Amino acid sequence: MLILISPAKTLDYQSPLATTRYTQPELLEYSQQLIGIARKLSAPQIGKLMSISDKLADLNATRFHDWHPDFTPQNARQAILAFKGDVYTGLQAETLTEDDFDFAQQHLRMLSGLYGVLRPLDLMQPYRLEMGIRLENPRGKDLYQFWGDTITEKLNQALRDQGDDIVINLASDEYFKSVKTPKLQGQLIKPVFLDEKNGKFKVISFYAKKARGLMSRYIIENRLTQPEQLKAFNSEGYFFDADASEKGELVFKRHEQ
């Protein structure tokens, strides 16, 4: 079972580390190409491209300039501990055990605009480069064209290494679009999280993102290997709704809090 999640814009390079173990990202030669392109952009150009404030544009121009491919624990941090968005609030990686990290390293992958595919313990230097950004490059007009089949090939390798063909898609549409599904050698399962509001169940972005992290943690902590086992997920009040689910899509609902 291979879990896919999105990265986060919010980063944490200060908190105590839950593990000192680390690995190196496997697609750094691609990252270097993107950094080379990004370094040619001025801060105002970065601001316009990413629709961010002047302050954030300056920060990310500095990050691109400071980035270099010699990753050490002194200048980088394990990806699963560096990302700090809603998904990672649900995942709570800072409380995982060493055995949990072992399982996650084999069964969890983070999709990334700059790094392509990250394993949990892969070191990464801080960046902001969302997958949906239209950054022109030698392979095309955006990052989807830049990455081409590379991300899919890396995921196929991970599927072979971990021994089955089940892919749990907990990534956002923006990031999952970087995966060429016809070429993915796996059976796709997409959990969907619906929260009740005014008597109706619907996707509420903040809750859905956190739930993706909760589900990731549930799989890791319980060492799940079969899709059927996902149906028992009940963190923070969610329950499986068989009637609303269909092939390839598992629907979980939660009553109004």
UniProtKB/Swiss-Prot annotation:
A motif (Helix-hairpin-helix) lies at residues 35-66. GO terms for biological process: response to hydroperoxide. Pfam families: H2O2_YaaD. Disruption phenotype: Significantly reduced survival of bacteria in the presence of 1 mM H(2)O(2); out competed by wild-type in the presence of H(2)O(2). In mouse infections bacteria survive about 100-fold less well than wild-type after 45 hours. Increased bacterial burden in neutropenic mice (depleted of Ly6G polymorphonuclear cells). Keywords: Cytoplasm, DNA-binding, Virulence. Its main location: cytoplasm. The keyword Secreted does not apply. GO terms for molecular function: DNA binding. It is found in: Cytoplasm. The keyword Cytoplasm applies. One of its GO terms (cellular component) is cytosol. Protects bacteria from neutrophil-related defense upon infection of mammals. Binds DNA. Belongs to the UPF0246 family. This is DNA-binding and peroxide stress resistance protein YaaA. It comes from Klebsiella pneumoniae subsp. pneumoniae (strain HS11286).
